């Protein structure tokens, strides 16, 4: 198996849904199914924070979400936990700057998809040189979902990555809504990653569909 091609990775990032059991006010599986029906292109399992599942419950829940993603042929990515990604034979893993280093992650994951959160050009270049398939850049806007976020980058911060010659696929993250999606794409992102814009929406299906429309219109 060869590593994913840039064009394919870029398309997969269009509507990137991130979710754990504690990001929903109703059945997470129902939310994910609606989102998949609405046009999610890639999914990340992120089970963190207050009230999150641990141990066997966490693994079982991850498998349920993974099974659903497989039905839709949507890649299933695990946040941070490389060992869980290997155990589940996930499609990939996403790591932050405080998680396991990209070099050892690439060694363990083989040719699977690896995404890395980058807040500076130096972090971005290091990640790319050591095997990142895409970058998560942000937070673009203020967000309440993550408590330990870095300083808000704004769309100017995102555009700066492109101005500095970063050509790998980029997904914008942090405070992204249907209303500000166009600005994120126009600044140079290949897609948007969201949690609450889908997980807490009245209709996960409608919200995802509108996000997908905004991305396609702005690319």
Swiss-Prot record:
Class of this enzyme? transferase
Name the HAMAP family for this protein: TMP_synthase
Q: Which residues bind Mg(2+)?
A: 80, 99
Which reaction is this enzyme known to catalyze? 2-[(2R,5Z)-2-carboxy-4-methylthiazol-5(2H)-ylidene]ethyl phosphate + 4-amino-2-methyl-5-(diphosphooxymethyl)pyrimidine + 2 H(+) = thiamine phosphate + CO2 + diphosphate; 2-(2-carboxy-4-methylthiazol-5-yl)ethyl phosphate + 4-amino-2-methyl-5-(diphosphooxymethyl)pyrimidine + 2 H(+) = thiamine phosphate + CO2 + diphosphate; 4-methyl-5-(2-phosphooxyethyl)-thiazole + 4-amino-2-methyl-5-(diphosphooxymethyl)pyrimidine + H(+) = thiamine phosphate + diphosphate
**Positions bound to 4-amino-2-methyl-5-(diphosphooxymethyl)pyrimidine:** 44-48, 79, 117, 146
Instruction: Tell me which residues bind 2-[(2R,5Z)-2-carboxy-4-methylthiazol-5(2H)-ylidene]ethyl phosphate.
Output: 143-145, 175, 195-196
Instruction: Indicate yes or no for the key word Magnesium.
Output: yes
Keyword Acyltransferase in annotation: no
Cellular component terms (Gene Ontology)? cytoplasm
What does it do?
Condenses 4-methyl-5-(beta-hydroxyethyl)thiazole monophosphate (THZ-P) and 2-methyl-4-amino-5-hydroxymethyl pyrimidine pyrophosphate (HMP-PP) to form thiamine monophosphate (TMP).
Pfam families from the entry? TMP-TENI (PF02581)
Alphabetical GO biological process terms: thiamine biosynthetic process; thiamine diphosphate biosynthetic process
The cofactor named in the record is: Mg(2+)
What keywords would UniProt list here? Answer: Magnesium, Metal-binding, Thiamine biosynthesis, Transferase
Pathway stated in the Swiss-Prot or TrEMBL entry: Cofactor biosynthesis; thiamine diphosphate biosynthesis; thiamine phosphate from 4-amino-2-methyl-5-diphosphomethylpyrimidine and 4-methyl-5-(2-phosphoethyl)-thiazole: step 1/1
* Record-given protein name: Thiamine-phosphate synthase
GO MF annotation: an example: magnesium ion binding
């Amino acid at each position: 198996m060869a590593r994913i091609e840039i064009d394919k990775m870029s398309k997969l990032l269009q509507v990137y849904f991130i979710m754990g059991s504690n990001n929903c006010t109703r059945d997470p599986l129902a939310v994910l199914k609606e989102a998949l029906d609405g046009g999610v292109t890639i999914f990340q399992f992120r089970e963190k924070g207050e009230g999150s599942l641990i141990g066997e419950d966490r693994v079982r829940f991850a498998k349920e979400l993974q099974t659903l993603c497989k039905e839709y042929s949507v890649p299933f990515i695990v946040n941070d936990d490389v060992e869980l990604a290997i155990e589940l034979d996930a499609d990939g893993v996403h790591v932050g700057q405080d998680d396991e280093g990209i070099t050892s992650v690439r060694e363990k994951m083989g040719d699977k998809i690896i995404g890395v959160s980058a807040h500076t050009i130096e972090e971005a270049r290091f990640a790319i040189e050591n095997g990142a398939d895409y970058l998560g850049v942000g937070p673009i806007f203020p967000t309440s979902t993550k408590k330990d976020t870095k300083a808000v980058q704004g769309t100017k911060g995102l555009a700066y990555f492109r101005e500095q010659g970063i050509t790998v696929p980029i997904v914008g993250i942090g405070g992204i809504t249907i209303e500000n999606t166009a600005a994120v794409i126009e600044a140079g992102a290949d897609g948007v990653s969201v949690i609450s814009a889908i997980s807490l929406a009245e209709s996960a299906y409608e919200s995802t569909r509108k996000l997908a429309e905004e991305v396609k219109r702005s690319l």
